[in-house]
């Protein structure tokens, strides 16, 4: 029995990145061997075991044979005669098909080290096309390693395009699509994930609401990049600069979906695109089974992001209505999330990237002023029932009016 470190741990150590988890392959053993040594079997479909002390995953070397559609249609063969090279051959990318012996020697039959050095994402074999989930994984790796200069090999992109064209992506479950997307949103370059999906034709299949934004123009005065699809990617990149919050990044991705509904004869104007986009956000989130808190923020951002751009000229009553609409009294984190997504929208434009966004701080300060007026003080003054809510609103509007009167007169930007 021989044991090898494989996959991401080897790849990340060679890249000088932190290794967060370790996966091992066991060659020349049976399940009975590992169970007798105290390992705990956890894989139902595949022979995967947990080490009795470290709790690392140890998998018996295996081969896989395509037996049906999608990413679950495989027959697994895990016997002591399966070699390490055979096990590595079934993996997605060459950079993930490098093994390290217990002595520290590398075993690299598919030249993954060379591709690491050259910053190339390349599939190991044509068996790549048997698993449609790998299209999303490559897009995610492209996003994760974009800051290191990684590019997708031409032949790998061609294979991904072929898979998208042949309809294999239709067999992916919503949960798997969202899981990969959620991971991609957490990378330093989430926009790259969606750009790769567009380049291979997968965006139109999995995210048609986003794909439909390409080719839709916006006024050049406010959007020198003109194309709404390009603007959307720029805003996602900006959101990643501003916040690590996946909720913020996803909401930014969806903020302009309503522009895809504007009749061409009305271009490049998109009046009412915010509220119009809410139903598209709902449909996208329902289809991919996006968690409710992420969905709810995305819907609010779609509806109200343009209002934040004009926040400095809003009347106190309108400001309070905005705070009520986003339920900021019970969910105060939404105030910061809305400020950040609106800033990402404003700065996610050609030549606007380094511009200040004073509306964000104005919104934050307005909320601070309004929140200093508490319901407890209203109750203490003897108000009861519905009168508490009405008096609380009146006092908050008054506080906002006093504060607003002290602010410098500014013109809003869009």
From Swiss-Prot:
Is the Transferase keyword given for this protein? yes
Q: Which CDD domains match?
A: HDc (cd00077)
Q: Which GO terms describe its molecular function?
A: ATP binding; CCA tRNA nucleotidyltransferase activity; cyclic-nucleotide phosphodiesterase activity; magnesium ion binding; phosphatase activity; tRNA binding
Question: Which transformation does this protein catalyse, written as a reaction?
Answer: a tRNA precursor + 2 CTP + ATP = a tRNA with a 3' CCA end + 3 diphosphate; a tRNA with a 3' CCA end + 2 CTP + ATP = a tRNA with a 3' CCACCA end + 3 diphosphate
Q: Which cofactor does it need?
A: Mg(2+); Ni(2+)
SS bond list: none
Keyword Chaperone annotated:
no
InterPro entries, alphabetized? CCA_bact (IPR012006), HD/PDEase_dom (IPR003607), HD_domain (IPR006674), NT_sf (IPR043519), PolA_pol_head_dom (IPR002646), PolyA_RNA-bd (IPR032828), tRNA_CCA-adding_enzyme (IPR050124)
Q: What does this protein do?
A: Catalyzes the addition and repair of the essential 3'-terminal CCA sequence in tRNAs without using a nucleic acid template. Adds these three nucleotides in the order of C, C, and A to the tRNA nucleotide-73, using CTP and ATP as substrates and producing inorganic pyrophosphate. tRNA 3'-terminal CCA addition is required both for tRNA processing and repair. Also involved in tRNA surveillance by mediating tandem CCA addition to generate a CCACCA at the 3' terminus of unstable tRNAs. While stable tRNAs receive only 3'-terminal CCA, unstable tRNAs are marked with CCACCA and rapidly degraded.
The family assignment reads: Belongs to the tRNA nucleotidyltransferase/poly(A) polymerase family. Bacterial CCA-adding enzyme type 1 subfamily.
Q: What is this protein called?
A: Multifunctional CCA protein
């Amino acid at each position: 029995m021989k044991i090898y470190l494989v996959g991401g741990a080897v790849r990340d150590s060679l890249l000088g990145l932190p290794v967060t988890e370790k996966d091992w392959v066991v060659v020349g053993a049976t399940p009975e061997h590992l169970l007798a040594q105290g390992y705990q079997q956890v894989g139902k479909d595949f022979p995967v075991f947990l080490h009795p002390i470290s709790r690392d995953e140890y998998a018996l070397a295996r081969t896989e044979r395509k037996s049906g559609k999608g990413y679950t249609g495989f027959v697994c063969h895990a016997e002591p005669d399966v070699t390490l090279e055979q096990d590595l051959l079934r993996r997605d990318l060459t950079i993930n098909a490098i093994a390290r012996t217990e002595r520290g020697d590398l075993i690299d039959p598919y030249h993954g080290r060379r591709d690491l050095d050259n910053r190339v994402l390349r599939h190991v074999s044509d068996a790549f096309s048997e698993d449609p989930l790998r299209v999303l994984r490559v897009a995610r790796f492209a996003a994760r390693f974009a800051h290191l200069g990684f590019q997708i090999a031409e032949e790998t992109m061609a294979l991904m395009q072929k898979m998208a064209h042949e309809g294999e992506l239709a067999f992916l479950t919503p949960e798997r699509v969202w899981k990969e997307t959620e991971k991609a949103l957490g990378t330093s370059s989430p926009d790259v994930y969606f750009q790769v999906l567009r380049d291979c034709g997968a965006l139109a299949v999995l995210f048609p609401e986003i794909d439909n934004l390409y080719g839709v123009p916006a006024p050049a005065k406010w959007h020198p990049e003109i194309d709404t699809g390009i603007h959307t990617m720029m805003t996602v990149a900006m959101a990643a600069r501003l916040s690590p919050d996946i909720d913020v990044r996803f909401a930014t991705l969806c903020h302009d979906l309503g522009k895809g509904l504007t009749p061409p004869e009305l271009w490049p104007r998109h009046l009412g695109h915010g509220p119009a986009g809410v139903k598209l956000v709902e449909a996208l989130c329902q289809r991919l089974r996006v968690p409710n808190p992420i969905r709810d923020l995305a819907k609010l951002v779609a509806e109200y992001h343009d209002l934040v751009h004009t926040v400095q000229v809003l009347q106190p009553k309108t400001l309070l209505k905005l705070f009520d609409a986003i339920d900021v009294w019970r969910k105060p984190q939404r105030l910061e999330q809305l400020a950040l997504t609106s800033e990402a929208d404003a700065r996610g434009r050609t030549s606007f990237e380094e511009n200040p966004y004073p509306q964000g701080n104005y919104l934050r300060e307005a909320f601070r002023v309004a929140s200093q007026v508490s319901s407890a003080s209203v109750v203490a003054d003897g108000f009861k029932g519905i009168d508490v809510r009405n008096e609380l609103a009146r006092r908050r509007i008054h506080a906002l009016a006093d504060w607003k009167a002290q602010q410098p007169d500014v013109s809003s930007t869009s």
